[in-house]
Amino acid sequence: MQLFYVIKADFLRWFGKKNFIVGFISILILNYFIVLQNIEGFKESNIINLVFYYMEDPFYIINFIVVASIMGTSYCEEKESGYFTFWIKRCNEKKYIFSKIINSFFSAFLLLASGMFCWILSLGIMLPWKDNSSDQFQVIIEQGMGNLLKNGHYIQYYIWYCVGVGMMAGVLSTGTFVISLFVKNRTVVIIFGAVLFYLNVSYLQ
């Protein structure tokens, strides 16, 4: 039962709080900033093509750095502030670490999944979902869950897309936290998280 309260206390520290809201807004602004660098290309694009190519942009990784900063670096922050001592007096290290792993995953998952989904939906105000004359659309629908796009189920497709991106963010944020147990410098911890992202992408490719 004590473990449940520790997890709950950590959860209430980030869910709906200032850092989470700022992170959500940062994801929206960041993604718009990246795609609007080529304003002419943006106007002539469509949502499906834009999101597909956007993942190849090197600045895409900043999304993962933003979400990892919510709980992925919490150990470093609590060691610096002395809050770690407060926790250890109330639970053992195993429960502390387990709670942080759970919250590192779900904070990053919820933040990036919701942020990306809202960003993609907002693109619909300015862009069409697809270009029927584009050969690239045929390439995209041959990939995972492409049948949803082919049948016009765009919202369903991007719900699953954002769930996948969110899970990747959760895993990387958890990895960032684990690294922070051994590396005390917060900046170095974040850099390691970025390296994990590139290794993950390279492995998947």
Language-model segments: what does each one mean?
Residues 23-30, 186-200:
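Central hydrophobic cores of alpha-helical transmembrane segments
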Residues 28-74, 102-181, 202:
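Secretory targeting signals
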Residues 74-107:
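Helix-loop-helix units of permease transmembrane domains in multi-pass membrane transporters
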Residues 1-24:
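Aromatic- and glycine-rich beta-strand/loop motifs that create alpha-glucan
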Residues 18-20, 92-94, 98, 185-190:
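Membrane-helix interface segments
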Residues 22-26, 98-99, 107, 111, ...:
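Hydrophobic core positions of alpha-helical segments in small-molecule transporters
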